[in-house]
């Protein structure tokens, strides 16, 4: 009976639904503090979205304005989210370009964010500000503390001119962040049953409310202003609170829909509930009408219906349900309860013209999820039924802990051993799952950063993830079926398994969403260009990126992004052998980025060298050939010699420049590389003083740099064949794949064994990409590995000669041989998967032995590649052996 009475009037006042959530009567100042904090979080998330749209100045201005307003309020309540947002923005800017000034600023801002987070966490705990339905007061600022600590530690580690003491402090910060995130992650997993239960109740209950109270945990609208719970004196404050709730709802709605960055945003233009059962889903309430006429008798049922947020039930009728009388559950009260969660097998169904897996019991945490058919509106609506604070906690922990797990699992073994001693190590698969979940389910800065990480891992120029060891015909059906992951608020373990087995079918969906939301940022164009190149669509990638900068309406505001954009486009031109465009972009980079100016100029010179050779070989026809060759020779010599002058601590042009990571004068690996290459060239020129500089070059460094950026896996057939021919320019007469014969010799110097090893290695890589595995492996064995491996048989210890001419080559050749062996073995119809795994694992361990000869150029990159492959093969061993 009492439940029926409670359902009979329109709602205005807010009262607690459980004693545990009560703050003592109508304590409006306490409610206002909670809503003020939630609004601050939404503002911070919007500011960081501005950065993702290449409008960092607007985002920073928004934060500064809101911080100033907060200070002028003279409130004792902190606003710890603003320093974190500023720190995240500075961190992203710093790690895009490594400029010393930005690195220092990021360190300072993140240190302030750490202090502010700690202060805010203590404040929320002391004043019992219940901003979450399941987590204790202050939890959200434990997340901001962990996030700021992690990012600060990374900044400190990347600033290599720090002292040993500073580096030790950074490792301690990293360990502190790891421990905090590990604890928070376990708490989230333990709280998942409670979260799912509360979410289901919210979805049942909000359909009869005038306003969503999800951001005031433990409270709901009452239905009778005449009751003892609602006094006329509290009505103005109730209206004010409802105004705040509506504003927060609209802020979250526009952020989820991607309309929060427009200058004239109409948050009603996209209706996430258009597929719901009712014929008409009205917009959010118009509280101006309520304020102008606050009497409940003046609000007709029709007006109340129009003012309802989730109006699926008629206003003014009895609606009695035992479920609706349920109180929300506090996670602290129920963590010890045994709440069974069923997990039936997934239901596969056709939806929107494509295959997908549909989920029923939706969890924004999504560690394990039941399956049943559901509409897209069910999936989308969860974003609005989850409070801003809970969303931030879940996405923040999953992003940060995921990044930590992946990065720690990829670092070279020598460093990994040190880190394991101080108490933490990574789990690659667990970390990748966290990143995928965050990228799919979170429409905030955490989701987009998770997506950027995934794109770098899968489509970036460095192979962090080795997917080269695949067992044919062993893939499950789920890996071959592609389902939609856009606009999802949940993803199951079974779905994640399918996604991680076939990532190239899912990253494009997320990237399309990001490009739709952030139309101004060239960073997303860059990522799409990388993705197209990784799929072998080199011309399409170049057309996309060149077309973007050619359009006068497009502008890249952040010079760090412009530098990355130019560098990647330069490499794409290099893969396509568009030498003039490649050199042009590299020369431009000198004015855009100070990170490795010497490499930019050196590679511009190598581009002219390669065009020179292409003309000499008769592969490119030009007018005034002799004049063109002379001009190219001059440009090649000029830029190749100019490059070392920009190397920090070495050249005259670097005397007043702060190059290197963090702006110190420590030389980067590629700085050391080009100094070594130039030293070799100078030695050859001394031995052949009458030769022109361009004729003293052996195997062109052009092909080395292409390999370092994974170019042979991105070239189309014609460019792979052209690479093999160009590499033959310096080959010994009548040798394999050489352009020279005893009667027709293009090269003026003798090909040394060291230069021949380089040439054959790159030709082998091109042959493999052409599918000519046997030829490529034969070159690798006979002309590269046999030159330094002196003993390699099952009955004797592995022995090799330590060579120094090209330090990266020797471990890399063994690493690449394992991939040749795998491809050849698994292409046979009756292949032995166990023997293939064992043989490849043996080769990779030998590569690891050869690699462990101390620090050298590309040592970290080489070790990372070997480790990624070993991890993949070890996984196969555990599966098949």
Curated annotation (Swiss-Prot):
Inclusion body (IB) resident protein that interacts strongly with lipid droplet (LD) proteins. Involved in LD-mediated IB clearing after protein folding stress, probably by enabling access to the IBs of an LD-stored soluble sterol derivative that acts as a chaperone in inclusion clearing. It is found in: Cytoplasm; Nucleus. It comes from the Eukaryota. The keyword Cytoplasm applies. This is Inclusion body clearance protein IML2. Keywords: Cytoplasm, Nucleus, Phosphoprotein. The keyword Nucleus applies. One of its GO terms (cellular component) is mitochondrial outer membrane. InterPro entries: Iml2/TPR_39 (IPR019412). Its main location: cytoplasm. Belongs to the IML2 family. Pfam families: Iml2-TPR_39. Residues 206-237 are annotated as: Disordered. The gene is IML2. Interacts with lipid droplet proteins.
